[in-house]
């Protein structure tokens, strides 16, 4: 008897930048490759956006769920490709899943941990920094919600970096000036974003401007996380909520 398919829906925030959906599809292909190594069942790994999509997320879940049920599938796993536990992860995605679940009574729609919660995320970020740089800045979007930036502060402390934010203080320029006041000569900057987009382009321009303003200082900016094999590896591990000693490799 053929095995029933297993389905995963990777959910991004959504962006008007065409690079984002393209990178999401690339990541989905890599995740499918990782997961296929540990199962003989047919795998469906697809993508969706919470915002700026052609259809609402709950409708996208229903569409995939209906197809899955027609092929004998019983479980659909939603994997939030979010780096922080903000309102989208806590409230918006669960609300969309609840709407879809009400229309899919024979299907178990599960929400996996969000990407940024992976215990090995810090190790991945550590490898992204240029080791030749003496000082580090981790740049995130930032939140105005009370306590909303605590996760970034914790990650930055783990990495030995200063946290900076795009939308709130302290900004990248402010943190760079603070480091320069200590006499540092080399600064590594890591944008904590999943894919390249308008904000990461603007951060790159800021880094260029800072380098022009401080020609004797060495600046290095890493790429966003991207649709790499390493990121796909983390997503594949989260998709089945494994215990730390049961992580699959790919």
Q: What function would you assign to each model-found segment?
A:
Residues 1-250:
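Active-site-proximal alpha-helix that buttresses catalytic centers in soluble enzyme cores
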